[in-house]
Curated annotation (Swiss-Prot):
SUPFAM superfamilies cross-referenced by the UniProt entry: Ribosomal protein S8 (SSF56047)
Protein's organism: Brucella canis (strain ATCC 23365 / NCTC 10854 / RM-666)
Function: One of the primary rRNA binding proteins, it binds directly to 16S rRNA central domain where it helps coordinate assembly of the platform of the 30S subunit.
Name of the protein in question: Small ribosomal subunit protein uS8
Gene that specifies this protein: rpsH
Sequence intervals crossing the membrane: none
Keyword field contains Secreted: no
């Protein structure tokens, strides 16, 4: 089955796994998904992830979700820019999530990064998702 929005599919899998209190969730691998997971890991929203490749050439990412005293660290994770409606922001218009308690993830010419990092590097881009 083909997926029209691979990043949205990964975020939905994470949201569903957190709702069911799962410790791990797997998703097909891609470079964009891995870069977004790098940001989530650096910001402390997931424990980590491992990428494995199968004999048929397909790769899969297994994501270890993070909990603090039984409560999921990820409370809300939403896709902003979708295949049918791309959302681009300048450095001045990067939104704050939950008054700075959450993060936005952007795809910029300098790579995939969190909102505060994009402000530091003075670069805008496509607003991929918000995490709180």
């Amino acid at each position: 089955m083909s997926v029209s929005d691979p990043l949205g599919d990964m975020l939905t899998r994470i949201r569903n796994a957190v709702g069911r209190k799962k410790t791990k969730v797997s998703t097909p691998a891609s470079k964009l998904r891995a870069r977004v997971l790098d940001v989530l890991q650096a910001e402390g929203y997931i424990r980590g992830y491992t990428q494995s490749e199968f004999e048929n050439g397909k790769a899969e990412i297994e994501i270890e979700l993070k909990y603090y005293e039984g409560v999921p660290v990820i409370r809300e994770i939403t896709r902003v820019s979708k295949p049918g409606r791309r959302v681009y922001v300048s450095v001045k218009s990067i939104p704050q999530v939950a008054n700075g308690l959450g993060i936005s993830i952007l795809s910029t010419p300098k790579g995939v990064m969190a909102d505060h990092e994009a402000r530091e590097q003075n670069v805008g881009g496509e607003l991929l998702c918000r995490i709180f």
